[in-house]
Amino acid sequence: GTLTTYGYLFDFTNADVNSTQNFGLRFAGGTDVSEDARVLYTLEYAIQKDYADNPQSFEAAYWLAEVGLAVYGLTFKVGMETLESDDGRSFQTPLATLHAMNGWADQFLVTPDDGLQDLYVSAGASAKGVKWLAVYHDYSSDINSLSYGSELGLLAVYPINKHYTVGAKFASYAADGRGVDTDKAWLWGEVKF
């Protein structure tokens, strides 16, 4: 596996509440268990604290634990991601694209005040040149035992050739105490020169 350490110091002069110091560790990789199977793993921990002119005093952590199995062209993963809350001030990622991480229905582009726990499972495959992916999320709060809802995401991507790719994506969020039921669908094409 690969161990990565990182530190990000954000000093936003016109949005002081987003000024934070962030330090973390990530360990990710895989181990072959047979000629056709590989166990995948990712562990990550980060701490976020107020920084510079941030008017709030807080400390919240980020946790990720994910395991998976890649076998015969299929990939299965299960994981838990937690963005903690420190008494209503949650771990935030103002420069991140949470669309890619916490569900394609975009219900968690900003971490809720009570934090976010995302328990997810995914299954992916490639067949006849098409990449398929299905992801199920179950969302809850870090504090106060709130259920936020669940989401199912489906993706298909087909590279026609080295220059053209088409894809389709669908997300269905079922609200349970946060937001409203939301369905989104995308069709797209990509051209590479």
Ranges and model annotations:
Residues 1-88, 119-121, 126, 132, ...:
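Signature for the C-terminal beta-barrel architecture of outer-membrane proteins
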Residues 91-104:
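Acidic/polar loop-and-plug regions of large Gram-negative outer-membrane beta-barrel proteins
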Residues 102-110, 114, 171:
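Extracytoplasmic loops and strand-loop junctions of Gram-negative outer membrane beta-barrel proteins
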